[in-house]
């Protein structure tokens, strides 16, 4: 079988040995959790957050069973300033500093604009765009001490058009703009900021917020005929957080097999 259709899970290379990384929305079984797992496999200590206590506890237990780096976490709703402030304080209390922040929280859905309520629009913008902004704003003063990195999770919908995704696409386009603009503001502090823009990453949340018919159509349009595994997106997040991308800031990498 073509390896592109059946990718091989990578081996760890200690890219983040003794580094401390904060990852938002890291519970469950999507990109956030896969990213947390990959950072551990690369030698990092991690602090994760999520909005659901039960799911967060399960994620922490599962990651600790890997018996790799240190794993801690707390509840955090990225729309709430006080919860974000507490999350960073708890992370610093655990590790004394942070070397990187993975800004993963986001919320999507499927709805045509004509049928969309103000509340539905506002919720996606508040979590996906405003939440990303608030995490970045809180991370900058913390990362000055280590000349750390921020990696945002965007989407190719920030570039591409897709019916039923106007709220999500607008939010992710905003995340891309934040990435580029704020990266210019943090250069003087040695802080790099980049983003990854996945095309189609398979995870349970995708199935909950989109129809099976739409997902099948999207998979058929990818050159590999499949969506990315969540750990394949995590690998790009790791690259952007590592010294391997030391010359890059303000960039958005498309994680896509292009459209067939």
Sequence positions of predicted segments:
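Substrate-binding pocket helix/loop in short-chain dehydrogenase/reductase
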Residues: 112-113, 117-125, 206, 214, ...
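Residue(s) in the substrate-gating loop at a strand-loop-helix junction
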Residues: 155
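Short, small/polar-rich loop/turn modules that mediate ligand/substrate recognition or access, typified
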Residues: 102, 187, 192, 248-250
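Alpha-helical segment proximal to the catalytic Tyr-Lys
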Residues: 141, 184-188, 246
